[in-house]
Amino acid sequence: MKLYQKFPETQVLTTQGVIDFYKDIFGKGKWLFLFAHPADFTPVCTTEFVEFSKAYNDFANLGVQLVGLSVDSVYSHIEWLKDIQEKYGIKVPFPVIADPDKKFARLLDIVDEASGQTIRGVFLVSPDGVIRFIAYYPLEAGRKISELLRITKAMIVNYKAKVVLPANWEPGQDVIVPPPNVFDEATMRMKMPKAKSWYLLFKDYNELPQDQKV
């Protein structure tokens, strides 16, 4: 799958039952944050599940549903989640997709055929079913959850307010109004207080309507 493509219309088996993405997530106005891990009972993936569990409410408060994925069986997932709860005292609150036949993972093009495992991938999908963010991480290094939360907030603001976000943007900081494609509008922009150029116009985040903020 690629950026801006439609997410597959399918159902998947998870540790919390069968999920229909378009009915159970997008149909309820939620975003999907899908993250794949290489395998259950592996060290880096275990630390990621602990940290994603800690951040679960941060995502949920944004209207984002976390969903995990690997090509392990649902029974393997259950045993692993039990082990995490016993070792760390954390109950994993999000569903984890079981995909032992690799059918769903191949739809997303995230199977490492050499190892047979899913790669450490991330897909952020808006409520209209469009993929807004994709990232891949190496086997050897875990994901930084705070950065994934930041990019999630950025894409939600982009989706709602139709603005774009500058480098290192954090909620509360200025946003950017997309550049115009009409000459007269480009000329008028230079008179605006936060204009750096006709193509770079900042806007105060606090001027956005409340329902467009995060």
UniProtKB/Swiss-Prot annotation:
Any one biological process term the GO annotation gives: hydrogen peroxide catabolic process
- What family is this protein classified in? Belongs to the peroxiredoxin family. Prx6 subfamily.
**Can you list the GO cellular component terms from the UniProt entry?**
cytosol
MF-aspect GO terms:
thioredoxin peroxidase activity
Q: Which HAMAP family does this entry report, sorted A to Z? A: Peroxiredoxin
Could you tell me which SUPFAM superfamilies the record lists for this protein? Thioredoxin-like
Record the organism: Sulfuracidifex metallicus (Sulfolobus metallicus)
Q: What is the lineage of its organism?
A: Archaea, Thermoproteota, Thermoprotei, Sulfolobales, Sulfolobaceae
Q: How does it assemble?
A: Homodecamer. Pentamer of dimers that assemble into a ring structure.
Identify this protein by name.
Peroxiredoxin 2
> Where is the protein situated, by its record's location annotation?
Cytoplasm
